Amino acid sequence: MKSYFLLVCVEGQSIRFHSPYAKKKVTGRIGHSVTFVWKFSGGVHTVIWGLANKKSIDRISGRLVYLSRRNVDVLSPGLVPVAYRGRVNGTRTGDSSFSQASFTLYNVTKDDERFYGCLLTPVDPDGLEISDLVKLAVVGMYIYRDLKTQGRGRHLVT
């Protein structure tokens, strides 16, 4: 009696970006909000949005939003850098074949000018993480008026 073995090779569902920023610049205005959108496909487990490492910008060092497959931000607010607490939000829509993640930074300041990154982690433990970076350029300035002659406080000029 002959025995036959059938070897079935299934290619893993690799993940990829469909709309990478590829380190391009996006302009945000002081006092306004800016939203970054990434579209992707494959077996993506988590989507992480964060600050690019200043020494090696291809790495994300400060996590701002951490979205699970169920669109739940599982990052404890206490882990978000102080300067960003209460000013960031993220959502994830779609399924394993095609998804989108949107991240919003509210009340932009000049200090927000830097690289931000989106990191996709695969469902497959043997899969590779991929990331994409975007540079936020901030425009606008504050003008401080004389309190005696022109009113109170600072006024935003954009």
Regions found by a protein language model. Name each.
Residues 1-11:
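Cleavable N-terminal signal peptides of Sec/SRP-targeted secreted and luminal proteins
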Residues 9-34:
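N-terminal edge beta-strand
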Residues 34, 112-120:
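Conserved Ig-like domain signature around the intradomain disulfide
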Residues 35-41:
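Short edge beta-strand/loop segments characteristic of extracellular beta-sandwich folds
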Residues 38, 49, 116-118, 158:
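Core motif of extracellular immunoglobulin-like domains
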Residues 43-85:
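N-terminal V-set
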Residues 73-111, 122-124:
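Extracellular beta-strand/loop-rich beta-sandwich domains predominantly from IgSF
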Residues 117-142:
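Extracellular/luminal immunoglobulin-like beta-sandwich modules
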